[in-house]
């Protein structure tokens, strides 16, 4: 296999401890699969590709993978999606979002970065047209 082909297959994973409170990334995949730390339980995994080259260099990777257990889904992800008018996780695919770090109310959990704005827009504009 050619080196260039191998490079296309592997994307370095960003170090979560180096991510800023907000960043922009394009969602590449959303899948529900078994939680690797708690076999028998499912979690939702969101894979997003960072869009800022300087950030990619500083976090040492271009891909962010966020795991949302059911408690994270209920408290953080679902409310964020509802604010954006998203009714299905499939609607996240292929779109670029601003992600924001949020901490759940329960102890012992790391922050999760949730989508808070689509392409820098937080929702529908309420401005009236000048015409």
Predicted regions and their residues:
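Short beta-rich binding modules
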Residues: 1-131
